[in-house]
Amino acid sequence: MTIFDNYEVWFVIGSQHLYGPKTLRQVTQHAEHVVKALNTEAKLPCKLVLKPLGTSPDEITAICRDANYDDRCAGLVVWLHTFSPAKMWINGLSILNKPLLQFHTQFNAALPWDSIDMDFMNLNQTAHGGREFGFIGARMRQQHAVVTGHWQDKEAHTRISAWMRQAVSKQDIRQLKVCRFGDNMREVAVTDGDKVAAQIKFGFSVNTWAVGDLVQVVNSISDGDINALIDEYESSYTLTPATRIHGDKRQNVREAARIELGIKRFLEQGGFHAFTTTFEDLHGLKQLPGLAVQRLMQQGYGFAGEGDWKTAALLRIMKVMSTGLQGGTSFMEDYTYHFEKGNDLVLGSHMLEVCPSIAVEEKPLLDVQHLGIGGKEDPARLIFNTQTGSAIVASLIDLGDRYRLLVNCIDTVKTPHDLPKLPVANALWKAQPDLPTASEAWILAGGAHHTVFSHALDLNDMRQFAEMHDIEIAVIDNDTHLPGFKDALRWNDMYYSLKH
């Protein structure tokens, strides 16, 4: 079972009574056929549920009102099968607070050249019915997605699936609770921000709990529970000699297991799905949570270090979006560079907390090494390299008057040399279009040093996320040129200042 099983998407057909009962029966039959086919053949993440035809203002308003109050409804897919006068939709769309996708399709793929008549034309009017619906959306400044294509087309299936993932993530974020163990790393700017504004804009709440509250739960974990989790470690990872039974760091592994179980219990009891820690606030914990955080991220929790609640929330959102897709998604940080003409590289990592969902190794290495930051005992961690291929890194920042999402398209590459003295998980990539352009654009746009790294999601996913939440997006990819990028930032400043 995945999070998508908790939701459904309503399929709504727009028409009108002008065409008579016979035509409306045909419309209903077509809709039933299309919904059944999409549910069985399109590999959609959510089930489509066909609703009654929308043929009058009252019917349409009732559907939209019911969608708002149904917790299982993640959004609406609307198909204008015939012409549906758009003034009928005004009241419904004005109250709708769920995501909306217009599926610009028609029942037949090919025109029946020899038999086409006006009955056929009146029945299959998506071509101009969809435009009428589009006008009222533009007139009302109603943000909605549009997918054009035949309902049997796999590209259309893919795009609807991607939108469904966004719709579900939007419902999840409205319920998201972020737990901060301690506060921000002292004097750091980008990890701070306006939590009230974030809750108003996105819906997620951010609150702080004392590390001492967590320590109480950690200390209550039984040896039996720890032993069971250690057995899972043994079967899932390659343990270094120091971490095996009778190894001199075995107790550190047991303590890491205790911390993992304690954090998870705390999060479950509080209904949290994202959290932060900071190495400056570890009072009562014997080590910085490393292995614990890595494993919890792999289970779908959002996380970021140093109290960075925005990145923790973004990671949770992107984890939900990417559920069931190939490739992983992780907390990440641009750590250091390799400058080589024509082969500039970024080495991404963090002190410990990189999610093993992006690991290339089937069984990452579990080790315990010294960590100079934090002043605690040596922490356990998983060490691995990252899968190669196209990926993105994304950052959500608070500019005071708005949120900006930065996305850099990257190409992850194989590490050309062993890293025998680097005891942390890492990712190596080439930034698009090149490191100088990408880094300068990122810096000019105010991008954070913390990011969410993903092989599973792409730029289109993040564009759709920004549109659905009505926030700014700044893209750095192979089409980026600094003069144009700077102009876009200036235009965005003007646009959002006028908008708000």
UniProtKB/Swiss-Prot annotation:
Pfam family membership, one: Arabinose_Iso_C
GO molecular function annotation: L-arabinose isomerase activity; manganese ion binding
Pathway noted in the entry: Carbohydrate degradation; L-arabinose degradation via L-ribulose; D-xylulose 5-phosphate from L-arabinose (bacterial route): step 1/3
Residues annotated as binding Mn(2+): 306, 333, 350, 450
InterPro entries noted in UniProt: Ara_Isoase_C, AraA_central, AraA_N, AraA_N_sf, Fuc/Ara_isomerase_C, Fucose_isomerase_N/cen_sf, Lara_isomerase
GO biological process: L-arabinose catabolic process to xylulose 5-phosphate
Cofactor binding, note field: Binds 1 Mn(2+) ion per subunit.
Origin superkingdom: Bacteria
Record flagged with keyword Transport: no
Listed Gene3D superfamilies: 3.40.50.10940
UniProtKB keywords: Arabinose catabolism, Carbohydrate metabolism, Isomerase, Manganese, Metal-binding
Function: Catalyzes the conversion of L-arabinose to L-ribulose.
Protein family: Belongs to the arabinose isomerase family.
Protein name, entry field: L-arabinose isomerase
Taxonomic lineage from the root: Bacteria, Pseudomonadati, Pseudomonadota, Gammaproteobacteria, Enterobacterales
